[in-house]
């Protein structure tokens, strides 16, 4: 993760601790680099924190403090439940979460070795038995979303790196998988909607939420909005009973698909779904696919969410012969002036933000199996046939032809 003139790096998934570490303690190594000089990179030091890190938003550097949000025992080694270590303590107690603050020791090597990142503060035992689903650090505050059956939003005061404390907590149904700061007092999130009775998750529902954190000791859910790309038939009141499969949005796990445009207070989210339907005219069943970009008004003044419109790429499926293994779903979007551009593997559309009418489109050739895959096989068979014919005539394919020019072979 790059933060101004600092680069924080963590190793990719490492399974050594999971299978061979007898201490049963998962940990993440953190490496810091100074990249303020464009001509060189300076290694600052390394440190270690307990647990594993969710993503780049779980790491931050602010005024010399490196803040890391992590979950310990995230993999839940349930088969060790009830077993004790050599000291009689339980080996597995369930996952736990923490925010650790590191400082670069620099030239002061009295406490620890030079080039080390030492722990100066920590908040431990945040939401026992839950795991971190999203995190964000903004100035001297940290925000965490943990989940087991319900989604608590945690607000952490990091103004004193030596004594970080939890300021507030809010339990809301569902879970947020990405936190986007609109301003210092407002958070915009995307995630999965709640299941029945507000517990668990309904993976068929993508949910947008708006949080008011102006009072960090009492964060509130200002508004939430479930969104779906499916439409309701005339004879169906609930899209979940009309045969639609779970809808999904790449923005729930890839922040690059989450497009918020502050000048217009607009949010763009791609969504897709499908269903298996019966065509009474052709007397056949077929798949019906939907790919849309949902636009949402984010009213910061009144702290509310509302639908602005949508961009539909569903027709691109009709032009895609290989939709079953390619991606016609909208992947990215960008606001430019008074227009919204939507991108999928099959095309690009341009829509007016004023009335959402389409002003232009560009079709992109779909993916297809390389033609040489079959041609190579056919060529090999043809060469094999030629070799057989040459052998029958009593000469090898690489030998000169009986009546050919000097140096020419039969294969030529």
Residue ranges, per PLM feature:
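Feature marking well-ordered beta-strand scaffolds used for ligand recognition
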Residues: 4-412
